[in-house]
């Protein structure tokens, strides 16, 4: 679950995961921390980042900085998605589909953080396979990035939006 939720520069910042990792050397283990964060404006722009440092706060600040640099724009249909989306990253597979008004965000931990930061308020989502937070966030991003609006599809095909939607 996303732990920290702060607003900075109009951006919603969410901490998805913090892990302790170890580097094994001759004299023993050197511990450090990795942080996974999601940043979004709640209006179709969202980014994620990973940071690693010897202390947790430093790892989180590095991850937030990386997330601000790694932002994408998502074509939303009001408060939901344009169409159902499948995506995968590693062994994680995600499925997201638009939902009617009032449904809410029905999604698991890491996916929920990304969708809420992007400004999606009504969606049905499911994660299959690996539930590793980093892979789920990556797969969710791939799905959101590959989603296209009817206007873009119509422009590519040289047709009107009415012809595309039937």
UniProtKB/Swiss-Prot annotation:
InterPro entries: Ribosomal_Su5_D2-typ_SF (IPR020568), Ribosomal_uS5 (IPR000851), Ribosomal_uS5_bac-type (IPR005712), Ribosomal_uS5_C (IPR005324), Ribosomal_uS5_N (IPR013810), Ribosomal_uS5_N_CS (IPR018192), Ribsml_uS5_D2-typ_fold_subgr (IPR014721). Gene3D superfamilies: 3.30.160.20, 3.30.230.10. GO terms for molecular function: rRNA binding; structural constituent of ribosome. One of its GO terms (cellular component) is small ribosomal subunit. With S4 and S12 plays an important role in translational accuracy. Located at the back of the 30S subunit body where it stabilizes the conformation of the head with respect to the body. Part of the 30S ribosomal subunit. Contacts proteins S4 and S8. This is Small ribosomal subunit protein uS5. It comes from Acinetobacter baumannii (strain ATCC 17978 / DSM 105126 / CIP 53.77 / LMG 1025 / NCDC KC755 / 5377). The lineage of its organism: Bacteria, Pseudomonadati, Pseudomonadota, Gammaproteobacteria, Moraxellales. The gene is rpsE.
């Amino acid at each position: 679950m996303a732990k920290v939720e702060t607003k900075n520069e109009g951006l919603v910042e969410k901490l998805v995961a913090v892990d302790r990792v170890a580097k094994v050397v001759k004299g023993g283990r050197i511990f450090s921390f990795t942080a996974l964060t999601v940043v979004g404006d709640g209006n179709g722009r969202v980014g994620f980042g990973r940071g690693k440092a010897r202390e947790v706060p430093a790892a989180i600040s590095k991850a937030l900085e990386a997330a601000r640099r790694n932002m994408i724009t998502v074509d939303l249909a009001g408060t939901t998605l344009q169409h159902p989306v499948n995506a995968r990253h590693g062994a994680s597979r995600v499925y997201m589909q638009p939902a009617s008004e009032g449904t809410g965000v029905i999604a698991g931990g890491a996916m929920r953080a990304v969708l809420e930061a992007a400004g999606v308020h009504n969606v049905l989502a499911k994660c299959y396979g690996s539930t590793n937070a980093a892979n789920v966030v990556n797969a969710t991003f791939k799905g959101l990035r590959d989603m296209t609006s009817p206007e873009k599809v119509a422009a590519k095909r040289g047709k009107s939006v009415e012809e595309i939607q039937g």
